[in-house]
């Protein structure tokens, strides 16, 4: 009866024997009204639209038209439940320091600039919350509610976001509902993550959201910055340990946890086969859910072809379900305990070796000289600048993308492997390393990814780039570690050369290498010219050549 009262003139012309068709026409009109923002006819939420679809479905089922009820109509219901009216949720993200500086600015100058002009960044932060509120008002809370805090250091960072969200609006009823997601990125932050979360759940706004969502909570882990901060070996082990501790903490508080993995793309950014990454997760950290970022440089490779896209999604979904099986969880738990001592020793040695390189006097300018780091920063590509715009100019403020890509351009790929060779050499027990490779998914995935990175390095060409820096001591550290890591990885996997037993990938790299070699040599010549230029016109011409080869 309620449906029939909504019939438009067009639907009313349809025979009463085609009631379902008439109702669907009404729904189509209401969808158009929703797009046009016609308040009288529009759907005010996707839930109302889904309710209408289910009414039609029940009616068809009761009429014994089950093929119609549970065929394409069921697909439409699933699509509506999955995508809503907004298609894809908009997630927001900002650095914790930006929030704290915005609050300091407001306290000093007043919310409306009563005691002086607010900084442009403060206006941008407040406008971000207003944009979030506008999206929610138009498309519902599911369209935009997650707010990620990069470089979360303490629970105060979470409080800052809730305070700014309130300050952005004049009327309390306009303040949008948000779920604040801490992002732990650096080694120290990963180690302190549980302490921060313990304080976080004491915040009233967080408690209210936990109650409203049935205890759902999301925590994000950063693979890129942790790798740049601690080195690939220590970052891998620290992330695994953090996930394990966070999962246990969530279980103890009856929290329905989703871990959001900021990984993908290059191996130095946590990349590699996604399905194997899922299977290597610690017990309790998946529970049939796995959320991760897809980096821009791999989106087309994974989703550009529908067949490949379906295969990739199916592979990750299968791994997610398999990893949640009790037998797999038990295996991962047992292997983590069995090789804990080995992991600890590798971690310490690799971390020390990595820090020794980074702390060598003059490393930062040398790195800028022997790689196209500066030129990458000048390219008008990418969604973010090469360095974080927080005023500092140290290596710490260099974003991970140019850090990793610069080493890749120099055919060194240092960000993926540096320190492991020394760690294995000091550990010395090849049998245990081989056994761990066979039994422990985390270690085997890590070693296989490093072997792939080593297959893409070229010592001959790397030496040409390193010669640009005139630092034999640093060159020796890099080349010695490259050789040592290659030796130990090949021993562990039982290969005579990288990717010997992964024929397809190995052949693909070998076919591509001659073409990349030519580009690399040309780029080295351009960089050599750039490093010597003083005249502005000549410098500009050399830069243009460098951009072309990049």
Regions found by a protein language model. Name each.
Residues 57-64, 77-81, 107, 133-136, ...:
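Structural signal for hydrophobic packing residues in well-ordered secondary-structure cores
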Residues 1-64, 71, 77, 220-228, ...:
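Catalytic cores of glycan-processing enzymes that make or break glycosidic bonds
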Residues 75, 127-134, 156, 160-167, ...:
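Alpha-helical scaffolding segments of alpha/beta enzyme cores, especially the outer helices
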Residues 4-181, 185:
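Structured, charged N-terminal subsegments at the starts of enzyme catalytic cores
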Residues 156-159, 191-192, 268-271, 508-516:
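Short, solvent-exposed polar/charged micro-motifs at secondary-structure junctions
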Residues 53, 60, 80, 92, ...:
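Generic structural hydrophobic/aromatic packing signal, biased to beta-strands
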Residues 168-346:
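Catalytic or ion-translocation cores adjacent to nucleophile or general acid/base/metal-coordination motifs
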Residues 86, 91-93, 98-100, 110-117, ...:
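Acidic, glycine-enriched catalytic cores built around paired aspartates
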């Amino acid at each position: 009866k309620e449906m029939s009262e909504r019939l438009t003139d067009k639907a009313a012309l349809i025979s009463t024997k085609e009631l379902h068709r008439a109702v669907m026409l009404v729904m189509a009109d209401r969808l158009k009204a929703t797009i046009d923002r016609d308040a009288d006819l529009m759907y005010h939420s996707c839930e109302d639209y889904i309710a209408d679809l289910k009414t039609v479905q029940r009616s068809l089922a009761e009429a014994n038209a089950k093929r119609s009820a549970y065929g394409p109509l069921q697909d439409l219901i699933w699509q509506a439940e999955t995508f809503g009216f907004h298609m894809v949720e908009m997630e927001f993200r900002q650095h914790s320091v930006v929030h704290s500086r915005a609050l300091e600015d407001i306290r000093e100058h007043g919310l409306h600039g009563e005691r002086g002009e607010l900084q442009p960044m403060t206006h941008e932060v407040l406008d971000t919350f207003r944009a979030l509120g506008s999206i929610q008002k138009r498309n519902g809370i599911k369209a935009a509610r997650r707010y990620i805090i990069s470089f979360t250091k303490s629970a105060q960072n979470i409080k800052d976001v809730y305070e700014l969200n309130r300050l952005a609006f004049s009327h309390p009823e306009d303040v949008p509902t948000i779920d604040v997601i801490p992002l732990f990125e650096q080694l120290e932050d990963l180690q302190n993550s549980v302490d921060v979360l313990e304080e976080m759940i004491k915040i009233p706004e967080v408690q209210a959201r936990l109650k409203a969502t049935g205890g759902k909570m999301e925590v994000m882990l950063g693979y890129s910055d942790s790798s740049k901060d601690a080195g690939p070996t220590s970052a891998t082990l620290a992330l695994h340990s953090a996930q394990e501790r966070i999962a246990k903490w969530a279980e103890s508080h009856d929290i329905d946890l989703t871990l959001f993995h900021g990984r993908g793309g290059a191996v130095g950014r946590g990349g590699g086969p996604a399905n194997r990454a899922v299977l290597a997760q610690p017990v309790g950290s998946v529970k049939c859910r796995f959320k991760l970022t897809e980096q821009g440089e791999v989106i087309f490779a994974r989703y550009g072809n529908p067949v490949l896209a379906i295969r990739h999604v199916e592979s990750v979904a299968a791994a997610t379900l398999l990893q949640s099986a009790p037998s797999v969880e038990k295996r991962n738990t047992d292997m983590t305990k069995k090789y804990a001592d080995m992991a600890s020793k590798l971690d310490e040695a690799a971390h020390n070796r990595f820090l020794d390189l980074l702390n060598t006097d003059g490393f930062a300018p040398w790195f800028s000289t022997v790689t196209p780091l500066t030129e990458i920063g000048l390219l008008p590509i990418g969604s973010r600048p090469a360095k974080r715009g927080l005023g500092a100019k140290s290596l710490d403020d260099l974003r991970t993308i140019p850090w990793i890509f610069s080493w890749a351009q120099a055919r060194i790929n240092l960000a993926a492997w540096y320190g492991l060779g020394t760690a294995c050499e000091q550990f010395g027990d090849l049998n245990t390393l081989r056994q761990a490779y066979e039994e422990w998914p985390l270690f085997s995935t890590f070693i296989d990814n490093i072997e792939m990175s080593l297959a893409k390095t070229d010592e001959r060409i790397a030496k040409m780039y390193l010669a640009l820096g005139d630092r034999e001591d640093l060159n020796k550290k890099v080349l010695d570690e490259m050789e040592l890591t290659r030796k130990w990885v090949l021993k562990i996997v039982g290969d005579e050369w990288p990717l010997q037993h992964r024929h397809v990938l190995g052949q693909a790299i070998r076919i591509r290498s001659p073409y990349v070699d030519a580009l690399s040599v040309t780029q080295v010549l351009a960089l050599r010219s750039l490093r010597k230029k003083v005249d502005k016109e000549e410098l500009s011409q050399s830069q243009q050549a460098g951009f072309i080869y990049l």
